[in-house]
A protein has these predicted regions:
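Short, C-terminally biased terminal segments at protein or domain edges
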Residues: 1-73, 77-144
């Protein structure tokens, strides 16, 4: 059971959170897709062979996390160049994940349906990220 002090802290947190801007990196559709992709990668890689724990499993998870983390970090950068640099790093991690998807299928760690689902998810993430970058380049309300 929580006490009065904890309830007061929770109320302060809720009040602070309600004053935060409504548009955060979590609002970016590319980040949302990337996050869903990461969760799916974690789910699938739980079934990879134990001897891949520090190999493909670790690398695939790290690359998936990198996509969404760089979108989040890039969002907070002030200049277009900085934003685009982090989003470009995300695109590099997307390419890395494409490789791990193919490798996972070729090693029979995932089936054809899982392969297609992963590939579709990563392609959607890439398309959304490219569109977001195009908006930044065209200066659609993003600070220089």
């Amino acid at each position: 059971m929580i006490g009065v002090a904890e309830v007061q802290e929770l109320q302060k947190f809720r009040q602070y959170h309600s004053m935060m801007p409504t548009f955060t990196f979590e609002s970016i559709k590319a980040w949302q897709k990337a996050h869903a992709f990461t969760l799916f990668v974690y789910k699938l890689t739980r079934n990879y062979p134990e001897d891949e724990r520090f190999g493909l499993t670790s690398q695939f998870r790290r690359a998936a996390i990198s996509i969404e983390a760089n979108i989040a970090e890039g969002y907070k950068k002030l200049s277009k160049a900085d934003k685009l640099r982090f989003f470009n790093i995300s695109e590099g991690s997307i390419a890395e994940c494409r490789n791990y998807i193919i490798l996972s299928r070729d090693l029979n760690f995932i089936n054809e349906d899982q392969y297609c689902e992963l590939f579709y998810a990563i392609e959607e993430t890439s398309k959304l990220l490219k569109a977001y970058c195009k908006g930044i380049i065209n200066n659609s309300g993003v600070a220089d």
